[in-house]
Amino acid sequence: GGSCGQCRVKVKSGGGDILPTELDHISKGEAREGERLSCQVSVKVDMDIELPEEIFGVKKWECEVISNDNKATFIKELKMAIPNGEVVPFRAGGYIQIEAPAHHVKYSDYDIPEEYRGDWQHFGFFDVESKVDEDTIRAYSMANCPEEAGIIMLNVRIATPPPRDLSLPAGKMSSYIFSLKAGDKVTISGPFGEFFAKETDNEMVFVGGGAGMAPMRSHIFDQLNRLDTKRKVSFWYGARSKREMFYVEDFDMLAKENENFEWHVALSDPQPEDNWEGYTGFIHNVILENYLGNHEAPEDCEY
């Protein structure tokens, strides 16, 4: 507990002192105002707490899997249909919680395209099994934007055991999600979120890598397609090799159609067959060396 920082409440009385596990997510100023992580607060006396207003708009839906396709070696795009007549009123940058029942999943049963199977075989991942005896809930950011209605789309990276010790447990939820097929039913709840764009004219700089693509795509599509923003927007994305890049055509099209948008990719381990002539290295270093380091006012940007 205390690792995701998503269960913030304001404790007005009765919560005791803030714990060290909470300080990675709550500043000293916020702590003085009573901000706490509810999962870390022991209820020993009567308490007075204040919950975020959006919590009371949370609902559950039983969705149906439309598709569950690999977008990279270890990342799937899970696309689910919302029940007819229903709406998940989320904002770009928001997230839902997804539920997994107790399950026994064999990685050898996964539908992994041939182009990605080499790494799975190399690391021995097809020998892995995930056995979970209880219901599990995890949070994932939406990759679709609100305008892409009727669906919930997630980018999920599988949490495999480390190759050096495949006897260690695999990620409970990601192992389950990778087993889903079209037509399967999945229960979600939401919407939740705090990672929302501010209503300013400031430049927007998006930085992400891997499955961190999801909220970036949601925000950027929302800004450019729905809001038709005139703010300067750039996206800096990190991937291991060219094979791990996805949504390339989408972002190329956005850059072509919007003169205020540009996007850049850095590969940390480009392969010879990639014939890569773009940025190399880790994306946080690349953006510092090639953009923010020479930016006239990086502190004014919205990240």
UniProtKB/Swiss-Prot annotation:
Pfam families: FAD_binding_6 (PF00970), NAD_binding_1 (PF00175). Residues 1-55 form the 2Fe-2S ferredoxin-type domain. It catalyses: a ubiquinone + n Na(+)(in) + NADH + H(+) = a ubiquinol + n Na(+)(out) + NAD(+). GO terms for cellular component: plasma membrane. Its main location: membrane. This is Na(+)-translocating NADH-quinone reductase subunit F. Residues 58-198 form the FAD-binding FR-type domain. Its EC number is 7.2.1.1. Its cofactor is [2Fe-2S] cluster; FAD. SUPFAM superfamilies: 2Fe-2S ferredoxin-like (SSF54292), Ferredoxin reductase-like, C-terminal NADP-linked domain (SSF52343), Riboflavin synthase domain-like (SSF63380). Belongs to the NqrF family. Keywords: 2Fe-2S, Cell inner membrane, Cell membrane, FAD, Flavoprotein, Ion transport, Iron, Iron-sulfur, Membrane, Metal-binding, NAD, Sodium, Sodium transport, Translocase, Transport, Ubiquinone. The gene is nqrF. Binds 1 [2Fe-2S] cluster. It comes from Moritella marina.
